[in-house]
């Protein structure tokens, strides 16, 4: 995938530490930072599927995971899921 691809980051609601279920982006910060560092344009899209994160490139889902498995905040450098997602976007056609 060329640099500066458009990546749609679809994310669902989740419950954090007993709080109500809602869409939150705190756990997406590292993933966004890693993709932005590679020069990709990121579009956030809320979905209704609980706990789900999907990366869509050229209308194809190239990566998905449970949002609660992503590290909270940070730059994503030490999160293995962020690296896995970055590679999936780079390998997308």
From Swiss-Prot:
InterPro entries the UniProt entry points to: UPF0728 (IPR027885)
Pfam families: UPF0728
Domain of life: Eukaryota
Family the UniProt entry places it in: Belongs to the UPF0728 family.
Protein known as: UPF0728 protein C10orf53 homolog
Organism of provenance: Mus musculus (Mouse)
